[in-house]
Each structure stands twice: as C-alpha cells, then as structure tokens.
Amino acid sequence: MENMEMNFRLCKNHLDHTFVDLGKTPLANSYLSKESDFEIEKEIPLKALVCQKCFLVQVDEYEKPEDIFNNYAYFSSYSTSWLEHTKKFVTEMIEKFNISNNDQIIEIASNDGYLLKNFKERNIPVLGIEPASNVAKIAEKSGIPTITSFFGTETAENII
C-alpha cells in the first residue's frame, strides 16, 4: 500500500524523493520454524525517502516494534568482535569522561548486556533497557539490571 501523502516525522516536510527502494524483505531476525509455511512469511517494503528540507532519511512503512522485538534472535554476545570492542570502548569512555562508581551508565537497546557488563566489572552502576524479553532475561541472569520495555517518555519518567 503506497502512502501518497507522506510527511517526514521530524520536520513535517512533504516527502517525495526516494533515496533507495530495495523491494520487499522479510522481517529481520524473524526466523520461521520448520513447521512454518514459507509462502506466508511476512514481508515488508524496504523503501527509504530523503527529506529535501533537513536531509534525514526515513522508511515509508515500518512494523510495530512489538512485532519485531517479541522474540529477538540476535544476541550481542554472539559476536567476538563486538565483545572485544566493548572492552576497549568502556576503557576509553571511563578515561575520557572520568566515569566512577558515583555515576550510572544506562544503555538503551542493551540486548544481552555485554556492553554494560564491562562497566559493572569496574563497579560502575548500570541499567539496561531492552524491549525483547527473551534477550533481557539473559542480561538479568548475568547480573545486569534490565528494564524490559521500549524506551520512551514513560520509561524515562520511571527511571528518573
């Protein structure tokens, strides 16, 4: 279904310039079970438009977050390069911003908590915010306090 009158969500400018159109694609990380009928796999259009006013890009259609993150298949800990990066990144951030145990690190979309784990190992209080409950449970089991929620105004107000 084509949206003929689309405005950019940020600046409200009319969008009519296609940046890239990749056709239809299955939802990321929404693997089908062996019993699933591949012919009914949900596909969504992957078309991005660029705003001629602010030059930011947005997709013309998107799925509800609840449909994407109800059982997320990707875990940060699967990537050895990510794990190595987080150790270096945390060391650099602690030094650059003089972070101590008097501070708190909050990560939005914290996945299984491996970035926060590096801060916690240095006795810096942490909090993860992760919408996918299956991934958030893994973070909690490894000792990373995690709020299972989408980050928005309500979640921010609850944290404060």
Task: State the predicted function of each range.
Residues 112-124:
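Conserved SAM-binding loop of SAM-dependent methyltransferases across substrates and taxa
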Residues 2-81:
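N-terminal juxtadomain amphipathic helix
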Residues 139-140:
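Conserved SAM-binding loop
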Residues 101-111:
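Conserved class I S-adenosyl-L-methionine
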Residues 132-134:
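Conserved SAM/SAH-binding beta-strand->alpha-helix loop
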Residues 81-102:
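Conserved alpha-helix/loop element of class I SAM-dependent methyltransferases that forms part
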Residues 143-156:
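Conserved SAM-binding strand-loop segment of SAM-dependent methyltransferases
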Residues 125-130:
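Conserved SAM-binding motif I beta-strand of class I
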